[in-house]
Amino acid sequence: MSRPRCSRCQRPSSLCLCALIPALDSRTQVLVLQHSSEASHALNTARLAALGLCNAELRVGERFEDDCDAARLSYLLFPGEDAIPLGSLADAAQPVRLIVPDGTWRKARKILHVNPWLAELPRVALPEGLSSRYRLRKAPMPGVLSTIEAIVTALNLLESPSRFDELLRPFDALIEGQIDAMGREVYQRNHADT
């Protein structure tokens, strides 16, 4: 029998993170396109980001409809040779819409592949050399962040340094809860060098 879950954060009721999730407003609209395989993942950071941002939406699936609004410039937050530095949009006269694919790198690339309209959007990238707080996963390459970390970094660059850091509180608690559940000794043995 499965444990009762919080209907909002989807965590087991005894590990509910809702008290830590802020309600932050942003000028930037965030649309997270989450691969369906991530939706039930225990460490689902995209859901935390969407819950903590008043101007965010989370869509789950693999194929998504193009509903880009001409009144709001849309950008794809995803690295690539043609990606422009995200910070260059900080002084944009009109609000922007940031579209963020969520999943493993392989699944995120698949989202881009099966949704050709995403490839038509201008890409923006985070600065190089960032380090992740995600101590439970080994990054496939240096400078890789979880979805929530990428969104917080992006919003801090676009709007105001450190204004969105509060969104990382439930993420930090999520990581600590997982470490406590596995035991500190197991964590040290398997993840201490990540």
Regions found by a protein language model. Name each.
Residues 1-3:
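Immediate flanking context of iron-sulfur cluster ligation sites
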Residues 6-9:
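Short cysteine-rich clusters marking metal-coordination/redox-active sites
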Residues 35, 79, 128:
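Cofactor-binding loop segments of dinucleotide-utilizing enzymes, especially the Rossmann-like FAD-
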Residues 28-65:
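Extended interfacial segments that mediate partner engagement and assembly in macromolecular machines
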